[in-house]
Regions:
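Short catalytic/ligand-binding loop motif for oxyanion handling, primarily in non-cytosolic enzymes
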Residues: 10-12, 43-47, 130
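A short glycine-rich, Lys/Arg-flanked "PGG" loop and its adjoining helix->strand segment in the class I
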Residues: 18-34
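C-terminal lobe and adjacent flexible extensions of AdoMet/dcAdoMet transferase-like proteins
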Residues: 98-144
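Short, hinge-like loop/turn segments at secondary-structure boundaries
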Residues: 2, 52-56, 137-138
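A short SAM/SAH-binding and catalytic strip from SAM-dependent methyltransferases
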Residues: 1-17
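Short, glycine/charged-enriched secondary-structure capping and boundary segments
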Residues: 16-19, 50-52
Length: 144
């Protein structure tokens, strides 16, 4: 089963909703069933947010704002896109939906209670080991 950061199963808005999602994942897997999850790393957010970034893509420029609600461990993300060849205007970055971010330690605890064992974690699709200094957290787990 795949659970990707683009919201295929859910956007991880708050703990209550997330536990429902994690429970559905655990129940959907047979013993020995495999789960791969790709989310943003809460440990990274603790030390790197708030911040503003820009990304020059093939068709345009994206300006992003990452705000961090430390007490709730919640990311508030907003962005504005500019297409090349169009006039620029002063950016007004609107807040997006809140997203509760988790550390590997938190995911390990939550999954353990649901009968999922973390086998490995990565920082990207090349297999780089996860760390608190990488924004991406990929977790590979098995249903016990």
């Amino acid at each position: 089963m795949l659970n990707m950061a683009d919201g295929a199963i859910g956007y991880l808005e708050d703990d209550e909703e997330n536990h429902k999602i994690f429970s559905v994942i655990a129940k959907a897997l047979k013993k020995g069933g495999k789960h791969f999850m790709d989310i943003m790393n809460g440990s990274y957010a603790q030390t790197h947010f708030p911040c503003k970034l820009w990304d020059a893509g093939e068709k345009g420029l994206t300006l992003s704002a990452f705000e961090w609600e430390k007490d709730r461990k919640t990311l508030i993300y907003g962005q504005v896109d500019y297409m090349y060849g169009e006039a620029f205007y002063k950016p007004e970055i609107k807040e997006g939906n809140p997203i509760r971010l988790y550390s590997l330690h938190e995911i390990t605890e939550i999954f353990g209670k649901l009968g999922l064992r973390i086998c490995n974690s990565f920082a990207d699709f090349s297999g780089k080991p996860s760390s608190d200094n990488d924004i991406q957290l990929m977790v590979y787990s098995i249903r016990e």
